[in-house]
Every structure is written in C-alpha cells, then in structure tokens.
Amino acid sequence: MNFKNHHQKKRFGQHWLVNNLILEKIKEVAELDEKDFILEIGPGKGALTSKLLDSKISRLHAVELDKDLIDLLNNKFRNDKKFSLQQGDILSTNLDSINKKITKVIANIPYNITGPILDIFIGRLGIVSKNNYKKIIFLMQKDVVDRILSKESSKNAGAMSVRMQLISNIKRICDVPPSSFNPPPKVFSSLVVFEPLRPEKRLDIKLERYIDKLLQISFNSRRKMIRNTLNSILSEDEIKKLAELSEICFNSRPQDISINKWIKLAEGCIKITNKN
C-alpha cells in the first residue's frame, strides 16, 4: 500500500490538512529551535511532519492510531534520525519515557476527542501537571475555541472558558475553512496556541479545586441565579456572609460572572467554611 491508496477512516475522525499556507503557519507559530522535542499527534500522511522535520529541532515523536499508516510513515521518514513513531491511541498511550523531554505538542485534533485531549495536555483545575510543555498548538473545531476564549455575559461563556483561561495563556491565530482539509469537515476550524502556566504561576491548588466545584454546580444549572445554586453547599447565613465578602451580585447567573469574581467567590467560600 502507498499513501495514494490509503483512504481516510471516518471512525478515526481523519480530516487531513492540505492547505500549505496553514501548514506553514503552524510551523511559524511553533517558533521551533534546536532544543525542541516535538510530540505530533496524528501525523496522517506526514504533510506537517515533513515541515517540522525540516526545522532545526532536536526530535519529533509522532503517535498515530491508524495501523495502516505506520509502515508508510516509517518508510517516508526512514532517513531522518530525528523522527520516531509510535502506534496507538493518544488517549491511552504511555508517554512516560519521553514526557519530561517534550517541549511542544502539535496536533490537528479529531473533533470527537477534543475534550479528553484538552484534559491530558492542557490540564485541569486542581491538578499540578508534571509536564514541561512550553507551547501546545492545536488545530481544532472553531466552535470549541469560541467557547474556550469567551468572556462573561457572552453566549459562549461557560465552565470550559473559565477553566482553560485559569491554567493557560491562549491565543487564536486564525480560522481555517473546511476546504483546507481532505475530506472537508462540515465546520470551520481554528488554529490556537496554548501556553500552560507554570505551577508557580497558578492559583493555590485548594483554591483551584474549589473554583472547579463552584463551576460544576453552577453551570449544571446555568439558568439559575448564583444564590439558588449556592443553596446546595452553603446555609442561608453563610450565603449572606459570602455576599458581603465577595461583593458579587448573587442575582447573577453563572455565565455573567467574570473569572476574577469566580476567584473571589471561591476565596470567600473557603474562608467561611473554614470558620465553621
């Protein structure tokens, strides 16, 4: 078999990037140098892989789920000592032997595994990552990026935006039309760069966990006012004290609360509950 005879598998969510301008843009925003150890998720036919290997990098390790592509990729890059390939599902692949060496992660993410991919590589509130990723460059569904970057009082505001913005710096580079892929997906994509915050730049872990707790209970009932949501974890007296401490309008709905106010709300909850 060769690449021409290989057909994309729908079950793997394969939409291969064929727009050379976007391939070059990914390489550009990665800001690669000779110290970089790249993890590429889902190299496909190796179009982006080729451009990355042409850069001054230390190494590129690719993880590909499709077994039919393994021999083809190994053959294509057999003369490049910087290249290594692993067959497997990135959601369950063991990367322990190289994880501390990886500096940048680059991927055209299958839409059906976006959530788990974000949890693994960007991280979660209340969990300190042992990874050393400087940049994570993802090509992902535009609607998801809209949600991640949304601000309070917007239609896309939600728990995901607060969580992602608290643990990483995020920048949308450009939107990418369906015609840039083969086969074209039904929706637009966005090229986005995440820079995970170092542990010393993160909030206190206990505070992060409480924020996460508040986000979960609040956005599960996003039409309810915060006052009514807090009834499930605080007494009426505690809610009154919290209103004084946090200076937040408790008639607000969760999507109308800014990130800074979520922090104040969690700090107030911790202070009140620790006194009792």
UniProtKB/Swiss-Prot annotation:
Keywords: Cytoplasm, Methyltransferase, RNA-binding, rRNA processing, S-adenosyl-L-methionine, Transferase. PROSITE patterns: RRNA_A_DIMETH, SAM_RNA_A_N6_MT. Its EC number is 2.1.1.182. Pfam families: RrnaAD (PF00398). GO terms for molecular function: 16S rRNA (adenine(1518)-N(6)/adenine(1519)-N(6))-dimethyltransferase activity; RNA binding. S-adenosyl-L-methionine binds at H15, L17, G42, E64, D89, N108. Specifically dimethylates two adjacent adenosines (A1518 and A1519) in the loop of a conserved hairpin near the 3'-end of 16S rRNA in the 30S particle. May play a critical role in biogenesis of 30S subunits. Belongs to the class I-like SAM-binding methyltransferase superfamily. rRNA adenine N(6)-methyltransferase family. RsmA subfamily. This is Ribosomal RNA small subunit methyltransferase A. The gene is rsmA.
